[in-house]
């Protein structure tokens, strides 16, 4: 708060570059963590919150007719144009924002003051939620070829590696230490990912300190041991992610790349991914294109091309695809490095892991991958993201490019990822917000020195709580997609508008397909909740609906009301005995057509039984029971009666059209209606008595 000289400024305008009308006034607030702009007019009083650590640059422009302009460009690609009345106040706000956005000390970062009102136990469990070492257990490590060693527990081997590393089981500690002395920043070759299907491994390290002629026996032994963990292949790839010219230039400085003559059975490949300085310049050119107010198609496309951004994304993806094919198709292990092994190496190993393993396309998988390949393996988040006031030449969008590669894969395989675009954007926001401790410092040792596990909170529990917001509605499940084989032809590499233009809504913001799907999913969940509530109401009835809506119960009801005239027509007419026996004995000798009529009765009775079963099936399908009606939206009327289209009569009675002949002794009023309905009282309507004619016929039969 010492840097805030003007906490509140009135009559401030927030200019929208898409809106030509005069901007409305508002109030600008400066806090220790956020810049907040509140519109002074309007019923909603819209608020704009900008985290101070998101601010990349603050630019104070010359005074105009509107006032004193102040432009903020943020690391999450928001651009805010404010206009203040007073030049003096504008200057004070400008100085405050410069100091607040990039503090000099790590302890001044937001994470050390952020307090979500959780207990100490909750904070500690949050840090244990994602464990990168457990991922190696998922790969079956330790095993006969690989071991997890804590030889780096005091950071004696490599200060930028985690305390526990995975190395070949056959090598000695002396070999590992000797190899580390031959690698830049002591970043010795260690396991990144093991493809269990064929034991092919992806390992990572930094460039060797070979110069033109230097060699190291321990380093050669370690690479040979890595190769021998995969007996299914006679060679191992060594992938240098840099352009060959850059690697050769490093040789002159005593570094460089492996000499194939000194290493047994290796095949060397260059990937041509540019360094951090080229990437920083490329992003700057891209953002200049994004800030054009009314660009023509030619201006936008030519600017996008000249930035080279999509070419860099393609190069990273091509490298990941090469490693994937080497592991899956050629069954060969791969060792990956760049210069120091914490930028391009992290990008390429992560992309290859996502292509090979569907686990990394889930919420937990991506969080573990980021923790394992980026945080614990020493990506320099503090310097690359510009968290503190320091050398601007160390800032570079390396992690942003990694998320861009994931988004490119999501565009080509929309059903293969459990999370959606918003999950990537949320992670990107918190990498720069400094609200959580995960991305502070440049390595694991830095975070321990800062005591982030005691003083700050982990971002992963926060993201897990919001999983419903980040879930991909098109996700087909863990096992639907195996190894991904994306295309990197030019027309498949797209500009990620949702990242770089996410805050430019324009006059008529386009409707996001993802938002539409999520809204549909939300509405579906609400309807399912309504149905569940209705089902609970149905169970309140005294008699369970399934006891009413069964063929046996239906038959009992018919028997009670009719004496089973359909299933036993002779008994109903007062004739004892089986029909066939009576006919053979001549008992039923009246009229030759009587037997045919009785056969017809039995046939109709069987048909009725079948129809009853069909009706019961329909009742079960639409959950009809009791006096509780299902809403009119489902096509069912109030008193437990469906409308005519469902095929049930209003009174739910059995009546009329399918009369059994008078010879059977059942009146024409007793039958199955055209609608085949049942009464709400489950009773039988109409005259159930025996007609006069049929009674006489029955008496005549008795006399016979």
Curated annotation (Swiss-Prot):
Q: Which residues bind a 1,2-diacyl-sn-glycero-3-phospho-(1D-myo-inositol-3,5-bisphosphate)?
A: 250, 275-276, 339-344, 380, 384
Q: What is its EC number?
A: 3.1.3.95
> Protein name, please?
Phosphatidylinositol-3,5-bisphosphate 3-phosphatase MTMR8
Can you state the subunit structure given in the record? Homodimer. Heterodimer with MTMR9.
Major subcellular site: nucleus
Q: Its gene?
A: MTMR8
Q: Which species is listed as the source?
A: Homo sapiens (Human)
Give coiled-coil spans as residue ranges. 515-541
Report disulfide bridges, numbered on this chain.
Answer: none
Under PANTHER family, the record lists: MYOTUBULARIN-RELATED, MYOTUBULARIN-RELATED PROTEIN 8
- Family of this protein: Belongs to the protein-tyrosine phosphatase family. Non-receptor class myotubularin subfamily.
Question: What functional role does this protein have?
Answer: In complex with MTMR9, negatively regulates autophagy.
Q: Which UniProt keywords apply?
A: Coiled coil, Hydrolase, Lipid metabolism, Nucleus
Regulation of activity is described as: Interaction with MTMR9 increases phosphatase activity.
Subcellular location(s): the record lists: Nucleus envelope
- Do you know which Pfam families this protein is assigned to? Myotub-related, PH-GRAM_MTMR6-like
Q: Where is the active site?
A: 338
């Amino acid at each position: 708060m010492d840097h805030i000289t003007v906490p509140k400024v009135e009559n401030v305008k927030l200019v929208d570059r898409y809106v030509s009308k005069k901007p409305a006034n508002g109030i600008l607030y400066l806090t220790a963590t956020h810049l907040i702009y509140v519109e002074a007019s309007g019923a909603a009083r819209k608020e704009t919150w900008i985290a101070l650590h998101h601010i990349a640059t603050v630019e104070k422009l010359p005074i105009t007719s509107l006032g004193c302009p102040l432009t903020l460009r943020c690391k999450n690609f928001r651009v805010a144009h404010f206009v203040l009345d007073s030049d003096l106040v504008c200057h004070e706000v400008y100085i405050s924002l410069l100091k607040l956005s990039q503090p000099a000390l790590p302890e001044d970062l937001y994470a050390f003051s952020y307090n979500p009102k959780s207990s100490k136990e909750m904070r500690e469990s949050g840090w244990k939620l994602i464990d990168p070492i457990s991922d190696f257990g998922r790969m079956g490590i330790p095993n006969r070829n690989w071991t997890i060693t804590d030889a780096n527990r005091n950071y004696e081997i490599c200060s930028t590696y985690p305390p526990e590393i995975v190395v070949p089981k056959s090598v000695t500690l002396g070999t590992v230490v000797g190899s580390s002395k031959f690698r830049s920043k002591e970043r010795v070759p260690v396991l990144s990912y093991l493809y269990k299907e064929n034991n092919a491994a992806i390992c990572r390290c930094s460039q060797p300190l070979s110069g033109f002629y230097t060699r190291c026996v321990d380093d050669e032994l370690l690479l040979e041991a890595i190769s021998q963990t995969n007996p299914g292949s006679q060679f191992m790839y060594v992938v240098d992610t840099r352009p060959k010219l850059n690697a050769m230039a490093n040789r002159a400085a005593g570094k460089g790349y492996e000499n194939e003559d000194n290493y047994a059975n290796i095949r060397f490949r260059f990937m041509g991914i540019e360094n951090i300085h080229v990437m920083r310049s490329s992003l700057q050119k891209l953002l200049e294109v994004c800030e054009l107010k009314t660009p023509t198609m030619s201006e936008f496309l030519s600017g996008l091309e000249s930035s080279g951004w999509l070419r860099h994304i393609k190069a990273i993806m091509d490298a990941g695809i090469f490693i994937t094919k080497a592991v899956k198709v050629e069954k060969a292990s791969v060792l990956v490095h760049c210069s120091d092994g914490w930028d391009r190496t992290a990008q390429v190993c992560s992309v290859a892991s996502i292509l090979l393993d569907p686990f990394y396309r889930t919420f937990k998988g991506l969080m573990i991958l980021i923790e394992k390949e980026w945080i614990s393996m020493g990506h320099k988040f503090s310097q690359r993201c510009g968290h503190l006031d320091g050398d601007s030449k160390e800032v570079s969008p390396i992690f942003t490019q990694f998320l861009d590669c994931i988004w490119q894969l999501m565009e080509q395989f929309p059903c293969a990822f459990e999370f959606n675009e918003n999950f990537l954007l949320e992670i990107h926001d918190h990498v720069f917000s400094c609200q959580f401790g995960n991305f502070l410092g440049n390595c694991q040792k830095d975070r321990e020195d800062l005591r982030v596990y005691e003083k700050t909170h982990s971002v992963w529990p926060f993201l897990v709580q919001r999983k419903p917001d980040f879930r991909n509605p098109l996700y087909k499940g863990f096992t639907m997609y195996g190894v991904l084989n994306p295309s990197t032809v030019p027309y498949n590499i797209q500009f990620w508008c949702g990242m770089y233009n996410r805050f430019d809504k324009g006059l008529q913001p386009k409707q996001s397909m993802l938002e539409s799907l999520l809204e549909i999913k939300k509405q579906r969940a609400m309807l399912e909740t309504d149905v569940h509530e209705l089902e609970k109401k149905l169970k309140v009835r005294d008699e369970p609906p399934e006891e009413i809506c069964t063929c046996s119960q239906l038959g009992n009801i018919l028997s009670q009301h009719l004496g089973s005239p359909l299933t036993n027509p002779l008994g109903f007419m007062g004739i004892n005995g089986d029909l066939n026996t009576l006919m053979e004995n001549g008992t039923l000798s009246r009229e030759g057509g009587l037997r045919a009529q009785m056969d017809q009765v039995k046939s109709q009775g069987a048909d009725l039984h079948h129809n009853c079963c069909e009706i019961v099936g329909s009742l079960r399908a639409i959950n009809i029971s009791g006096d509780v009606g299902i809403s009119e939206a489902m096509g069912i009327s109030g008193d437990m009666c469906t409308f005519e289209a469902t095929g049930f009569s209003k009174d739910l009675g059995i009546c009329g059209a399918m009369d059994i002949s008078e010879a059977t002794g059942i009146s024409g009023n007793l039958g199955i209606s055209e609608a085949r309905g049942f009464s709400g009282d489950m009773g039988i309507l109409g005259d159930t008595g025996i007609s006069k004619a049929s009674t006489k016929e029955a008496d005549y039969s008795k006399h016979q």
